[in-house]
A protein has these predicted regions:
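Acetyl-CoA-dependent GNAT
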Residues: 6-10, 17-88, 92-94, 105-107, ...
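Active-site beta-strand termini and strand-to-loop segments that position acidic
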Residues: 51-53, 158-161
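Conserved active-site tyrosine of GNAT-family acetyltransferases
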Residues: 135, 140
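Active-site acidic-Proline motif in GNAT/NAT acetyltransferases
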Residues: 92-94, 98, 127
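Short hydrophobic/aromatic beta-strand or adjacent loop that forms the aromatic wall/cage
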Residues: 45, 152-156
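Conserved GNAT acetyl-CoA-binding A-motif
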Residues: 112-124
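Conserved beta-strand-loop-alpha-helix junction that forms the acyl-donor binding cleft
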Residues: 122-132, 148-153
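Extreme N-terminal starter segment of soluble prokaryotic enzymes
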Residues: 1-2
């Protein structure tokens, strides 16, 4: 059975332990675990999960604060008042195409709206045409900015809630 919900502290740990295990040898994932757990604890972000039979299989995080490292102070991406950033959308390969991330994003958008956010931004590498197409289909169709990140061109779009 699939569940789509806010990540509890235990589920948040399980998600990050899974991510770290899938990226053995890449120490950055351990740093991100600490960072995102801290963001969830202090209200700078909220992580949501897709679970299957109690195990995490997908995730996404809403970043509210411009101080989150992925936002890097760019107020057009997240400003802590009316604009949040949708970050780190992931789903296990075996569940891709099943609509699970779409369902999770709808829950995340409602969560943001209920807390006064009226705009959500999302970014994708320019070469990820499939993801860009999906985001446009979801209504993220107002171009916000672009920048180079880790050697890739990332395009950011916004959706008004």
């Amino acid at each position: 059975m699939f569940r789509y919900e806010e990540a509890s502290p235990d589920m948040l740990n399980a998600v990050w332990d899974k991510n770290i295990a899938e990226h053995t040898g890449d120490e950055q994932w351990k740093h991100w675990k600490e960072e995102y757990i801290s963001y969830n604890s202090n209200g700078s972000a909220k992580t949501f999960t897709v679970s299957y039979d109690g195990s995490p299989v997908g995730e996404g995080t809403l970043l509210f604060s411009p101080q989150c490292s992925a936002v890097r102070g760019r107020l057009e991406l997240a400003n802590g008042t009316d604009t949040a950033n949708l970050n780190a959308l992931r789903i296990d390969k075996r569940f891709e195409g099943g609509g699970h991330i779409s369902k999770l994003v709808k829950i995340m958008e409602k969560y943001a709206f209920d807390r006064g956010f009226r705009h959500i931004t999302i970014g994708a590498e320019a070469r990820e045409t499939r993801n860009l197409s999906i985001y446009l289909h979801w209504g993220y169709n107002r171009f916000v900015t672009s920048c180079g990140e880790e050697g890739a061109l990332v395009l950011y779009y916004q959706k008004d809630l």
